[in-house]
Amino acid sequence: MADAFMAAGARVFICDVNAAALEATLASRPSLAGRVCDVSDEAQVAEFFVAGMAHLGGLDVLISNAGVAGPTANVEDISLAAWRQCMAVNLDSAFLCARLAAPVLRAQGSGSIINMSSTAGLFGFPRRAPYASAKWAIRGLTRTLAQELGPFGVRVNCICPGSVAGERIDRVIAAEALKTGRSEAEVYQEMVHAASLKTLIDPADIANLALFLTSSAGARISGQELAVDGHTETL
């Protein structure tokens, strides 16, 4: 996502809870800046926002892109702590960031917010109750913010990715295989065949949609939930 926006000429300020990962990312991209931040922590988000505003000199686009998979288990086997941790990272983070961005964008009369939902926010998702619940809630937050901020020229949309190729989906596949007693190859094939296009999603597909929505080409698009998922038929 950051690479795509920088390639389009944007100045970008990112965060990561993993200090080593952030350091490696910034070292390989001299024009990129960022700060270590746990986006479920109110104080850390406030510090991140202050640092980002100071570095960028303003704000045009906020992309709330942090997320964790949460537990893979039947609902009766999920602890309240695991539920809350999943909600904190996937939902609270978007709220905390939007709460800080809204006054800035409203005052300048322009800007765009992109929240990251999921196809899990469009379907029920067995054994993933916390994750699906958070992603459904992101849709509600998005529509509400679109109504609140629209009169001030601020657009708010959410993207609903399908199964995105990469290390994260590999961990999800492994967890599902372990829980259900199937092989990882079987779970992978099930994911691929859940979409009409019979393919996983490339991260660039999501970044390209975010670029479109935040550009002048998306100037009249707000309050929308756009799936980048190869047309998921079922989860």
Model-found features: residue ranges?
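C-terminal helical subdomain
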Residues: 158, 166, 182-217, 221, ...
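Short C-terminal tail/terminal secondary-structure segment
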Residues: 69-72, 123, 199, 210-211, ...
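Residue(s) in the substrate-gating loop at a strand-loop-helix junction
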Residues: 118
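Short, small/polar-rich loop/turn modules that mediate ligand/substrate recognition or access, typified
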Residues: 150, 155, 221-223
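Canonical Rossmann dinucleotide-binding motif of NAD(H)/NADP(H)-dependent dehydrogenases/reductases
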Residues: 1-13
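Substrate-binding pocket helix/loop in short-chain dehydrogenase/reductase
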Residues: 73-75, 82-87, 113, 191
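Active-site helix of classical SDR
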Residues: 98, 134, 142
